[in-house]
């Protein structure tokens, strides 16, 4: 390869940007979900805004108690049949086991294997 002239690369000078001035004290309620707002949102009574974790547990217990035992639908994705490609995470973020090698067809059998 031959040299065709001068390089056009020129490093840009570094710019110093001054940080913004602090206008006043930072209010933690703007940045944290743990701090309760001064006024409750519309449609929500103020008495139920105690602890989000405790409130969620109470809702879960009430919902499951009225419906009875749930079928074992957690082992598979709901509404999606298994395609034989279980290399993605499940609906709850837990990894699924790889398919059984005895059940998986090899490409030598005439079919293409799907890739994730």
UniProtKB/Swiss-Prot annotation:
Expressed in a variety of tumor tissues but not in normal tissues, except testis. SMART domains: GAGE (SM01379). It comes from the Eukaryota. Pfam families: GAGE. Residues 102-116 have a biased composition (Basic and acidic residues). Residues 31-44, 86-95 have a biased composition (Acidic residues). InterPro entries: GAGE, GAGE_fam. Residues 1-116 are annotated as: Disordered. Antigen, recognized on melanoma by autologous cytolytic T-lymphocytes. This gene belongs to a family of genes organized in clustered repeats. They have a high degree of predicted sequence identity, but differ by scattered single nucleotide substitution. Their sequences contain either the antigenic peptide YYWPRPRRY or YRPRPRRY which is recognized by cytotoxic T-cells. Belongs to the GAGE family. This is G antigen 2B/2C. The lineage of its organism: Eukaryota, Metazoa, Chordata, Craniata, Vertebrata.
